Amino acid sequence: MSAIQSTQELLQPIGFDTPVAESKTVLLSPGKEWRARIPAESKLTIKIVYGIAELFGTELANGVEYTIQCANIAVYSVDHVKLEWKSLDELETTVSPDTNMPYLYNLHFALEKMRLSSFDGPRILVVGKASSGKTSLCKILCSYALKSKAYTPIYVNLNPQEGAFSPPGFLTATPISDILDVESTMWGQSMTTGATKLHNKQPMVKNFGLEMIAENRPLYMEVLGQLAQTVDGRLKNDPLVRRSGVIVDSPPLQHLDESYTELEVAITKFNIKTLVVCAPDDSLAVELSDRFQTLVRSIVRIPTSRGICNIDDVARRALQRSQIREYFYGNGSTVLSPYTIGVDLLDAVVWRPKSSLTIDMSKTSPNMVELERVEVTAANLQHALVAITYAPRKSTAEEVFRSGVLGVALITEVNDAKRKMRILLPVPGRLPDKAMILTAYRYLE
């Protein structure tokens, strides 16, 4: 009996203590901002106990926990707010007055006045250098437009290094008809990801496929023009969207050429009327005014917020990886179930954009806007992100280039010997009989 007891004691499971994050409380008076920097592998959970608080313009519900990772956030208190937060990691947090909100309110009310005075809503282009708060401003303007009336502004992302309702590598235009997902690193989920907690958005997607605009400026401006054409079609067919307006988020100015040719193309193609400059002083606004005063009606400067954090290359890579992972697997509150399929290499037709990094421009003058065929091998496609187009598999390079993007897939494995590959799709089903475009982005699970 004692031997049996001793054996049972030996077989008892070993207890592991699950770490529990200690909840901390912050009291915010009206007009204050609570800021937190969340590293790539850390998570932050926040809850508004009482009061009215916003995260980049989206009001946070009382008593609801929000889990956020791989981001820098700023919770703005409209009213007296009690905020609880917890994290297993040590996070850098600060509380300070938000002196920028009066400027944002004035800009929002000016845009609202445009919507009320004309059937053609405001068309604005937000410009600035890297880490100037451009994207945060766009989120706030989109969210405030929804609060005013049942508007549906189109948000246009022209920065291929950051995804908006898509992984990085794409230019997108998305009608914003419902609140944004504050837990998402890419604004929210699109229709291709299936059922989610919040209303899915239906982005218009064009593939650029490269990381840097400088790798192929002619291609970038051609894709930008295609997206603008698609947006114009939506505006003509939807009076509500036309009245709501278009908010265009430009790439950082450091990524453009010295004469800002890409901005000129964006202003012309999207019929921009107002240039919003995010900068700490007037020098940039004056420079852009000299360059574009004949193309736009007005130029407005919004001061750079003191809470803006510089994003280095390591943080940007972490954000891109998080956006790719979220596209297929969801985030903390919305878990998605992607689907892996096996495909014969002979059934895959893959194209890719040309890059100045891989072409000797001194020996040849190729048509940089054309796509080139890719040999389906492990060396070219292993762990690659590919765009599945609407173009049939046997389409020409021109037809594939002009086609829109149906969805994004991840090639997880390529076996050259067996002539097979495995592809991760965001939804169950067979691989569409469509041509694919290889992007410069890779993701290793």
Curated annotation (Swiss-Prot):
Required for endonucleolytic cleavage during polyadenylation-dependent pre-mRNA 3'-end formation. Component of a pre-mRNA cleavage factor complex. Interacts directly with PCF11. InterPro entries: Clp1, Clp1/Grc3, Clp1_C, Clp1_C_sf, Clp1_N, Clp1_N_sf, CLP1_P, P-loop_NTPase. Pfam families: Clp1, CLP1_N, CLP1_P. GO terms for cellular component: mRNA cleavage factor complex; nucleus. It comes from Eremothecium gossypii (strain ATCC 10895 / CBS 109.51 / FGSC 9923 / NRRL Y-1056). Belongs to the Clp1 family. Clp1 subfamily. This is mRNA cleavage and polyadenylation factor CLP1. ATP binds at E33, S131, S132, G133, K134, T135, S136. It is found in: Nucleus. It comes from the Eukaryota. The keyword Nucleotidyltransferase does not apply. One of its GO terms (biological process) is tRNA splicing, via endonucleolytic cleavage and ligation. Keywords: ATP-binding, mRNA processing, Nucleotide-binding, Nucleus. GO terms for molecular function: ATP binding; polynucleotide 5'-hydroxyl-kinase activity; RNA binding.
